């Protein structure tokens, strides 16, 4: 009996040590992630759309950010880029008129992490199934422009996001992804429609996480 009790206590002690070690590893990982984020500078394309909300989230997470509004801004040093929601046609036109298109496309193709929300998804898409417009075309997805806008308008829901669990999602006249190809990963679907995807250094969502208090999608991007 005494031997069995000692064995049980020994197992319990080993389990507790393993649990403590796991908790310590998690805390260290979170600490290292926070330190890494604090060293980052994120550029936010601020030609049109919901760019300020992204900046607020970045500030909350401890990352420095600045706005790209004109050609001289692109010469500043930055680690990654956010392309916000808004009107993709207007943003695509301004990228060319302000002579930002070539440099941004080159940096993305060179491996710089980029995150496109809503209109940003359309700008990064290789093609658009219901529009002949061609923008940056760096990501192997086929976008469906204003897909939700014509049917449902704006709405809020919650859905599973790969690696993050269930997260809130706000859609505003949003697109969705008709097709992914090459090595693009599907990260989230709502009612059978692809609403988030990643291809190496590129992340896109059809929804606007910057409009919710949940910061997990931005943290995911900053840790890419």
What are these regions (language model features)?
Residues 32-97, 102-107, 215-219, 223-224:
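N-terminal beta1-alpha1 cap of cysteine-dependent amidohydrolase-like domains
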Residues 88-159:
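Cysteine-nucleophile active-site neighborhood
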């Amino acid at each position: 009996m005494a031997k069995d009790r000692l064995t049980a206590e020994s197992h319990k002690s080993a389990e507790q040590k393993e649990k403590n070690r796991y908790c310590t590893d998690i805390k260290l990982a979170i600490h290292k992630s926070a330190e890494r984020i604090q060293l980052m500078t994120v550029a936010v394309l601020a030609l049109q759309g919901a760019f300020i909300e992204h900046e607020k989230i970045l500030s909350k997470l401890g990352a420095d950010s600045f706005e790209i509004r004109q050609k001289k801004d692109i010469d500043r040093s930055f680690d990654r880029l956010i392309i916000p929601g808004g009107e993709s046609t207007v943003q695509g036109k301004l990228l060319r008129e302000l002579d930002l298109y070539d440099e941004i496309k080159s940096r993305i193709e060179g491996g710089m992490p980029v995150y496109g929300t809503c209109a940003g998804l359309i700008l990064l898409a290789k093609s658009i199934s219901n529009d002949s417009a061609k923008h940056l075309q760096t990501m192997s997805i086929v976008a469906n422009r204003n897909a939700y806008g014509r049917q449902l308008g704006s709405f809020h829901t919650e859905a599973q996001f790969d690696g993050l669990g269930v997260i809130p999602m706000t859609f505003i006249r949003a697109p969705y992804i008709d097709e992914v190809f090459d090595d693009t990963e599907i990260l989230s679907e709502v009612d059978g429609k692809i609403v988030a995807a990643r291809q190496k250094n590129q992340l896109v969502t059809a929804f606007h996480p910057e409009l919710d208090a949940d910061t997990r999608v931005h943290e995911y991007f900053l840790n890419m």
